[in-house]
Amino acid sequence: RDSVTRLCYCGSVLHTRAARAHATREPLQFGAEIYGHAGLEADLEIIELAKASLLVADVGSVTLDMTDVRIVDALLQGQTLSAAAQAAIHTALAAKDVAELTKLTRQLPASVANGLCALPQLYGDVQVLDEAQKCLPSSPLMDSALQNLKWLAQRLGDVRTTFDLADLRGYAYYTGVRFALFGGDG
């Protein structure tokens, strides 16, 4: 397609186990996506749509959580790692296992190893992005990822926003900003 495409979906998702006591095994999940526009405006539009949908659904307070998969890409850029080594690093990041990350990154340049080991601590409010700029090695890809997150956060000031720079859910699918919105108790 040469045009922008907007998609939405809604339906029940069956879980083998409930997330918590007295919770349903078949929660309602809905989502929306925009294809065909690579700019931040599309990310902003879809986040605003998701936020508005949660507010209309009267789910209570809304929290936005964001990351950018290019942060890990920027750290690993230029490194020759096997698929197994990359998978092990991703697993350790997802578990926020700094001890395992330290072992896995021993052979990498210090700036890369230190950056990867810093990611599990880089979560919280927008100040995390300033901390990331101080402790992660600068590169065009890294700088762009952090600036994009800041740009979005500035335009979404009316919603509680958190960042988890080690969050790799959907890493293989996403190419930039990844976000999740939570209503009520999240």
Q: Model segments located where?
A:
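Positively charged, Gly/Ser-enriched RNA/tRNA-binding surfaces
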Residues: R1-G60, T102-G186
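Short, conserved phosphate-binding/catalytic loop or strand-edge motifs used
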Residues: E26-F30, M66-A74
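Hydrophobic mid-domain F-helix/FG-region of cytochrome P450s
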Residues: L49-V56, R70-T80
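A generic structural motif
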Residues: L64-M66, H90-A92, D164
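Short, solvent-exposed helix-helix connector turns and helix-capping sites enriched
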Residues: D68, K96-D97, D125
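Short glycine/threonine-rich loop-to-helix capping motif typified by GTGT followed
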Residues: D73-A83, Y173-F179
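Acidic, His- and aromatic-enriched active-site or binding-groove loops in soluble protein domains
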Residues: T80-L104
